[in-house]
Regions:
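N-terminal export signals
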Residues: 1-15
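Metallo-beta-lactamase
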Residues: 16-21, 28, 124-175, 180, ...
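Conserved beta-strand hairpin/beta-sheet module of binuclear metal-dependent hydrolase folds
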Residues: 28-81, 184-196
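Divalent metal-coordination and catalytic microenvironments
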Residues: 32, 57, 67, 82, ...
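Active-site metal-binding motif and surrounding structural segment of the metallo-beta-lactamase
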Residues: 60-64, 72-117, 225
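Active-site neighborhood of phospho(di)ester-bond hydrolases with catalytic His/Asp-centered motifs
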Residues: 66-68, 91-98, 117-120, 175, ...
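Divalent-metal (often Zn2+) His-rich catalytic cores of metallo-beta-lactamase-fold enzymes
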Residues: 216-267, 271, 275
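C-terminal regulatory/interaction regions
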Residues: 264-305
Length: 305
């Protein structure tokens, strides 16, 4: 089921020219599927919010972009990468979920007039988060945040959406609450390339912004999908599919089991954040930045079981 809507926060007429990103590389991971691998570093004026894996799929008729990056400069760099590969128009921009490292570059594509596609829950979450997200972006990037406007989706997905790029069929699929409550994946049927966005983290600490039990359930559903290639939301690996999901599943299982034990033993949420899952620290980048938040999310969910 689809719903249509449109809204853009306009860029001021006096806006400065956006900063440029140098050495913006894309890798063809399968025929017609191009990925730019973002940094694990925190957002800063040096990386301009280039912190997530983003990319595009090229059809004979048009291009589908998978996430737009964390700022206008990142989005513009991605659009230039598209143009280095093909002159065909960009017809779809899929915003896989409502996290700023994936959507703040969307304004770069407005002149192409694509459909901006998101999960049906995306607008509700964005309405609640837009102002703080913009404030944090300006805090982190300063003047380099100029023009990184919020672009609302024009097409909402409830379930599954099949798209024809011309000689290439692509499936956009919504998922139950997991990483967020508005997760989408993209599957290129021609090459069986699975773009998972933040339903898959490789080496970077996975993040729970919805439900740990839901995330574990979705991982089991993801494992059943037959794919020859995959793209994570963060990180990269040569581990075959679906075994690449195993470290993430292990991490969540450790948090789940140890948080339940902490609750049974009447530990406070503060105690849980200081004790649960610390054995996993050696396995993940950005562990200190995200792990305690994951335990907090898990505790608030599991204490009501």
């Amino acid at each position: 089921m689809l719903a249509a809507m449109a809204f853009v926060i306009a860029r001021p007429a006096f806006a400065l020219e956006p900063a440029q990103i140098g050495n913006f590389e894309v890798t063809e991971v399968a025929p017609g599927n191009y990925v730019h691998y973002g940094s694990f570093q925190e957002r800063s004026p040096e990386n301009l919010g280039d912190n997530a894996n983003i990319g595009f799929i090229v059809g004979e008729r048009c291009v589908l972009v998978v996430d737009a990056g964390g700022s206008l400069p990142v989005g513009l760099a991605l659009k230039k990468a598209v143009r280095r590969v093909t002159p065909v128009p960009i017809c779809h921009v899929v915003l896989t979920h409502v996290h700023p490292d994936h959507f703040f570059g969307a304004a770069a594509f407005l002149d192409e007039k694509p459909q901006f596609i998101a999960h049906r829950n995306y607008p509700r979450q964005l309405a609640a988060r837009a102002r703080p997200y913009l404030n944090y972006l300006r805090r982190d990037l300063g003047d380099f945040a100029e023009g990184s406007d919020i672009v609302q989706p024009t097409l909402l997905v409830d379930g599954r959406l099949e798209l024809d790029l011309g000689g290439r069929s692509v499936l956009v699929q919504g998922w139950p609450p997991a990483h967020t409550d508005d997760d989408l994946t993209v599957f290129d049927r021609a090459t069986r390339t699975f773009w998972l966005a933040d339903l898959l983290f490789v080496d970077h600490t996975p993040v729970i912004d919805a439900t740990i039990t839901g995330f574990l359930a979705v991982i089991e559903d993801l494992r059943r999908i037959e794919a020859d290639h995959y793209v994570a939301g963060h990180g990269r690996s040569r581990t075959p599919w679906p075994q690449v999901l195993d470290p993430q599943r292990r991490y969540f299982t450790v948090i789940l089991d140890e948080t339940r034990a902490a609750i049974r033993n009447r530990k406070t949420i503060q105690q849980a954040t200081e004790e649960v899952g610390l054995s996993e620290g050696k396995n993940w980048a950005a562990f200190d930045a995200f792990h305690r938040r994951n335990v907090t999310t898990a505790y608030t969910e599991l204490e009501w079981e």
